[in-house]
A protein has these predicted regions:
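Long, charged low-complexity segments
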Residues: 1-20, 26, 30, 80-207
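Short, contiguous, well-structured surface segments enriched in hydrophobic/aromatic residues
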Residues: 8-48, 58, 63, 70-82
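Conserved interaction-surface patches within small, structured recognition/assembly domains
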Residues: 49-53
Length: 207
């Protein structure tokens, strides 16, 4: 069976694929965290003076931010399928302002610690997490070091968004252009239906 471009886009942008990417990022984060003891580096500049930095902190936080961003956008798409219609991602999702995105999600409440972490990710993703500077002087912010407390908050937040997506998929997700998605969490299989059934395995492990 042939699918048009809009249908292909929906299948690739369906909520389960955002979850898969988030899982991959989380796995990479765990790999890094296990090597957290590899050491620190001491930096000095005339602005900030001496700073002690973990060798994995910036990268770990960047991956954490991307993982949460994928889950947030996947959950929003699960709630608002029209955001991936007509072969385009909605302008509402073309942003790294993930706190605002998270606060727009139906049925989600965030603790102050979780909101603060999302604020950190908003600074990390476009700036010090991957570049030495942001695109505008007004966006410069102090770098944050990854800590065990941040890791615990991340894991709680990750699971919170993930559970919400799974609850929607268990009921069956109806996307645009005739695409639907049903998740069989026990078997670890996702089934995409478009006039016929297409089965594929995901990276999620069976319970």
């Amino acid at each position: 069976m042939k699918y048009d471009k809009n249908q292909i886009f929906v299948m690739k942008a369906a909520p389960n694929n955002w979850v898969d990417y988030a899982d991959e990022l989380r796995n990479s984060m765990e790999y890094l965290w296990e090597r957290e003891s590899w050491g620190v580096k001491i930096e000095y500049d005339k602005i900030d003076g001496y700073n002690e930095k973990s060798l994995i902190s910036r990268t770990w936080l960047l991956l954490a931010g991307f993982a949460i961003e994928n889950l947030i956008k996947g959950l929003i798409i699960a709630q608002y399928p029209s955001y991936i219609s007509n072969g385009k991602l909605s302008r509402e999702l073309r942003t790294h302002k993930i706190l605002n995105l998270a606060m727009s999600i139906e049925g989600i409440s965030l603790s102050s610690e979780e909101q603060n972490l999302l604020k950190i990710f908003e600074k990390c993703i476009p700036s010090w997490g991957r570049y030495p500077i942001p695109i505008d002087i007004e966006e410069i912010s102090a770098e944050v070091n990854a800590t065990t407390k941040i890791k615990v908050t991340f894991e709680t937040l990750f699971d919170k968004f993930n559970i919400q997506i799974e609850e929607i998929l268990k009921q069956g997700w109806k996307g645009p252009h005739g695409c639907t998605l049903v998740s069989d969490l026990k078997s670890g299989l996702d089934t995409q239906v478009l006039n016929e059934i297409i089965k594929h395995k995901t990276s999620r492990k069976p319970d």
